[in-house]
A protein has these predicted regions:
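Extracytoplasmic small-molecule ligand-binding "clamshell" domains
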Residues: 26-94
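Acidic, polar ligand-binding/catalytic clefts
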Residues: 68-131
């Protein structure tokens, strides 16, 4: 399954690379990468080192393209605006490519897809999106989880947080009834917080692609990222990193990398 996804991603890159000309130079200086410190398995900090699927993949891409990276922690709610204004050269944090976000930043070719998990404490009566009515549901502001909740469970009481850790803390204390995270993040929280009696009650797989964000018009940097991504897919690095961080992630049959 993962080989199929890797192949599809690789095929999509051919068209994207052809469209990447040169404008703003990526340069030889260190690139500042805005990322998160608490969003497993995509982007998190462990023993003082930024890691996760997205960040390790970006490191491999950078090595292939001889790019230097400096990872800096931020909040997801402000990440894209910080890329847009040039505070960060790259945004790396399982960023879903939506039409609204493309108005603010440009994206690399897709390298993964969005999968969500509805997580709840025992005894809340939450089993799926239809049972969220009147419940206090935590989401990180500005994420696909936020927009998904508004579209699919408008009668739920959305409680917005700046980052995953704050939503998890509220869920553990009972300040909210449930939360929506990336599926793998939700499963990790449930496994590592047994006393909180958390459960991923429903997984929601989408075909929304993930991409690294760059400032609009920076086609040179986007082109370097895409060239490196193509290379690490071809040499098997993509699959190894994916297997390391998301070994059980389902791959939707209808997923098409590069779909806009």
């Amino acid at each position: 399954m993962k080989k199929t996804l890797a192949a599809v991603v690789g095929a999509a890159l051919l068209a994207v690379l052809a469209a990447c000309g040169g404008s703003e130079s990526a340069g030889g200086d260190t690139l500042r990468v805005g990322t998160l410190s608490d969003s497993k398995p995509n982007a998190y900090q462990e023993n003082g080192v930024f890691t996760g699927f997205d960040n390790e993949l970006l490191k491999a891409i950078a090595a292939n393209q001889n790019l230097k990276l400096e990872f800096v922690s931020t909040e997801f709610a402000t990440l894209l605006s910080q890329v847009a204004t040039g505070k960060f050269d790259i945004g790396s944090s399982g960023i879903s490519q939506t039409d609204e976000r493309r108005k603010t930043v440009d994206f690399s070719a897709p390298y993964n897809y969005q999968s969500l998990g509805i997580e709840a404490r025992e005894g809340t009566g939450i089993t799926d999106e239809n049972s969220l009515t009147g419940k206090r549901i935590g989401v990180v502001q500005g994420t696909v989880s936020d927009s998904w909740l508004a579209s699919n469970a408008p009668a739920a009481q959305a409680v917005r947080f700046p980052q995953d850790a704050a939503a998890l803390a509220a869920l553990k204390t009972g300040a909210i009834d449930g939360a929506i995270f990336d599926q793998a993040t939700a499963e990790d929280y449930a496994a590592k917080n047994p006393d909180a009696k958390l459960k991923v009650v429903k997984a929601i797989t989408t075909t929304i692609p993930h991409g690294f964000a760059v400032k609009k018009g920076n086609t040179e940097l986007a082109g370097k990222i895409n060239a490196g991504l193509k290379a690490v897919i071809a040499d098997g690095t993509w699959e190894k990193v994916h297997q390391r961080f998301e070994p059980n992630a389902p791959v939707p049959a209808e997923f098409k990398a590069g779909q806009r």
